[in-house]
Amino acid sequence: MAGGGQVVLRTLSQQGWVRGSGAAVLSRLQDAAVVRPGFLSTAEEETLSRELEPELRRRRYEYDHWDAAIHGFRETEKSRWSEASRAILRRVQAAAFGPGQTLLSSVHVLDLEPQGYIKPHVDSIKFCGSTIAGLSLLSPSVMRLVHTQEPGEWLELLLEPGSLYILRGSARYDFSHEILRDEESFFGERRIPRGRRISVICRSLPEGMGPGEPGQLPPAC
């Protein structure tokens, strides 16, 4: 990430998963932008991938998202899952959402081709509530968050296959977020080669919406 100032690296199990422009932004977002590496076992990753592949294969990659936020993608909303996958999604709900939060009944599945990427954007409150939680499959990637008013304040998340990321509150509404394209995919000085990436995204209910109400697909990561 370009820019001056001190770069701070938070480490977990002797490896860095979150890095930022300084201690203040890391402190501010320590509970609002969370990475849990190794959340899925290899078998669980394969369970989700096998279930999603037939449905995704029927769709073509697109290059013009409705709000121009995503390039090289295909996506779907999925509400019917095998029991094995439902068990995984229940673990996501327990890990990321509070007891008072209701989830949207459909799960957003986003498939980025190797050269696909998500441009910086801020989520709309029309499409999902205060929390989103995403499982990363197939390829590592780097998510970058930048403060909308103070671009010198930024955070980067290393999302490896099998990891869970959680964005809440300020991380979603005060910061833009993006998935870096392959040629920009670095975590500090470490190159993170991009391949095809699937994210499985659970979302809390927007305020005032019933859990079964349909909505336009959000530009979620």
UniProtKB/Swiss-Prot annotation:
Residues annotated as transit peptide in the record: 1-23
Positions that bind Fe cation: H121, D123, H177
Residues the entry annotates as binding 2-oxoglutarate: Y165, R197, I198, S199, R203
GO-annotated cellular components: mitochondrial matrix
Record key words, sorted: Dioxygenase, Iron, Metal-binding, Mitochondrion, Necrosis, Oxidoreductase, Transit peptide
Swiss-Prot/TrEMBL cofactor(s): Fe(2+)
Record's protein name: Alpha-ketoglutarate-dependent dioxygenase alkB homolog 7, mitochondrial
Species name: Bos taurus (Bovine)
